[in-house]
Structures are given as C-alpha cells and as structure tokens.
C-alpha cells in the first residue's frame, strides 16, 4: 500500500472491469450501490474526502480500492482515473449517488468511458433555478421569482409576491435551506441568512402551495421513463420543511397513477433526461401537479431498501446497469 490509496488484497482474473464511485455515505442508497456493483462483478473504486472511510477501512470490504481525494478538484480526479487505466483497469462507468456530485461523475464518465448519462439534464436538476427555467410557461411550475440583490421590499412589490412564500438556496439539496416565510420580516431574515451562507448566489423564491406531496422514483433508459415507486410524504409545516414520514404506495388508484405518470413523464422529458435515474417531488394543488423539486439520483437513506422490500427491485443495481449502457431488468 502506498500514499492514501488502500487496496484490499484480492486476485482479479482476466480483465478488471471497474466502476468508480465519487463519494458515498456509510450506509443507505449510495453505499448499497457499491455493494450492487461488487455483486455484478465489478472491481469497485471509491473516491472519498471522508477521513472516516479511511480510518474504518475494514467496514468497507465491498470497496476494493479506496482513494482519498478532494471531490471538488476535478483535474486531480482526472489524473487518478488515468492512473487507474494505466494499471490495466477497464473503467466502464464513473457514477455518484451523492448530492452535488452526480453531474461531475456524469461528465467524467462521458469523458473516460463514453457513456451517455444525460449530463445536461443532471445539471438542470442540480440547480433549482435551471429546473424552473426548463419548465417555464408550463402548468408544473408555481409562481416564482429570483432574487439577486437590491431592496427586498421593492423585489416583493415588483414580483407581486404574496405570503406565505418558500425561500430556497438553488444549489442546496438540504431541507435546512428550504424555508417557509409568513411575513416580510421573516422573508428578509431568511434571505439575508442564505445570502451570507451562499455569497454571490441568487435566491429562489416560490409561491407556497398546499396539497398532498409525493416522491416518485424513476429510471430512464433510451428516453423511456419507468416509474419504479410512488411514496406519499409527510412534511412538517414548521419554518423548515422536513420529511417526517414515508408511505410507500403498493396500490395506487388508477386515476391518481395516470395523472401523476403523465406529469412525471412530461417533466422528465422537458428536463432532457434520456438515460439515468431521478426522483421528483410533486404536490397535487387545485387539480394540477406542481413540481416541488427534481433530483438526478435515487433518494438517499433507506429508500433503496424500502423499494427492494416492497417490490423486490434493487433500484441502485438497476441504475448501475443503465450507467454501463445495459437495459434495466
């Protein structure tokens, strides 16, 4: 072993079919994806910035090679990938199941593996403002405005905003950066906090809408959208929006499924996803589906396990198949 690269002693016969993962959590969907890749016969390489992963190497037996690297330093990752190739590893895909890293992985995978993982669509989903722009003048958007700088009072008047409102940091996937405000003083406070936290970033301001909220997990292969699971979400209605419960719907009323699937397929096509996976969060408001958020990955946490228990589908494994150009089964 040398430097920060740790390799599990293992004899690999024939071509070393390799899959590179950019980032992971210790458990949950991103970790289960690595286990799925190992089951499929891949030599698994993990790029990580978490020192915890290196310190607890024995707990990552499904990771054959663990490389400590700055995941924001794309040139350094390129050099590491080239080194892996020089060692004889046949890299078939570079993937990530982690917020903010899916686009980087898709770009590197296209560059080194000639895969087609709809990187432009991923980029739109990782930026909430780009998502809204892609759905401009469609019924799936609620009223929204983009605050960059200047008087907040003038911004409210100019855009004819009425409370309550939702304030979002466009590049954050965390619920801590999605805030409900009921009055002008709260609005000014929340916007200023987000501007301090993300200097130079615009702020997305949306109309607050009521209605039941659903999370829809999808797989997209060669332009065909497959709805894998529909989950009704319980959302706290405090200032921060936190999911407090999931109800995976094993039986969905026909009219609900038909209207929801039409909306999901339309939205995914407008965003340009042709190959890959994404989950959408939608509300049904005044007889119309409204997109709350789109994310270019499977939900984290226990989602992969929930779907496997309910339907017998390992969604992370199916995503890996799409990443290497195979049809999901």
What is each residue range found by the language model?
Residues 207-273, 277, 284, 291, ...:
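ATP-dependent carboxylate/phosphate-activation module, predominantly the ATP-grasp catalytic core
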Residues 11-121, 325-328:
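ATP-binding N-terminal substructure of ATP-dependent carboxylate-amine bond-forming enzymes
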Residues 3, 20, 44, 153-157, ...:
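Peripheral (often C-terminal) accessory segments that flank ATP-dependent C-N-forming ligase machineries
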Residues 6, 15-18, 151:
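Residue-level detector of intrinsically disordered terminal segments
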């Amino acid at each position: 072993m040398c430097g920060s690269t740790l390799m599990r002693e293992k004899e690999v016969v024939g071509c070393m079919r390799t899959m590179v993962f950019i980032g992971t959590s210790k458990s949950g969907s991103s970790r289960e994806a690595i286990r799925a890749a190992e089951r499929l016969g891949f030599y698994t390489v993990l790029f990580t910035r978490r020192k915890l992963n290196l310190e607890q190497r024995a707990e990552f037996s499904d990771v054959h090679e663990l490389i400590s690297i700055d995941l924001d330093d794309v040139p350094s990752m390129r050099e590491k990938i080239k080194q892996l190739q020089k060692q004889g590893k046949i890299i078939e895909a570079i993937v990530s199941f982690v917020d903010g890293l899916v686009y980087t992985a898709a770009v590197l995978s296209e560059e080194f593996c000639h895969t087609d993982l709809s990187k432009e669509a991923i980029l739109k989903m990782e930026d909430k403002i780009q998502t809204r722009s892609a759905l401009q003048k469609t019924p799936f958007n609620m009223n929204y405005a983009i605050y960059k700088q200047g008087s907040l009072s003038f911004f409210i008047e100019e855009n004819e905003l009425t409370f309550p409102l939702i304030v979002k940091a466009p590049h954050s996937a965390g619920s801590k950066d999605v805030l409900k405000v009921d009055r002008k003083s709260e609005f000014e406070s929340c916007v200023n906090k987000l501007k301090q936290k993300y200097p130079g970033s615009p702020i997305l301001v949306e109309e607050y809408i009521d209605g039941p909220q659903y999370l829809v997990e999808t797989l997209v292969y060669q332009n065909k959208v497959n709805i894998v699971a529909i989950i009704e979400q319980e959302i706290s209605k405090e200032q921060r929006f936190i999911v407090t419960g999931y109800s995976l719907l094993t039986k969905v009323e026909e009219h609900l499924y038909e209207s929801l699937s039409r909306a999901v397929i339309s939205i995914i096509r407008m965003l340009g996803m042709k190959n890959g996976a994404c989950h959408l969060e939608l509300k049904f408001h005044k007889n119309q589906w409204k997109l709350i958020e789109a994310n270019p990955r499977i939900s984290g946490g226990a989602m992969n396990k929930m779907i496997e228990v309910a339907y017998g589908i390992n969604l992370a494994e199916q995503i890996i198949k799409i990443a290497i150009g195979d049809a999901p089964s």
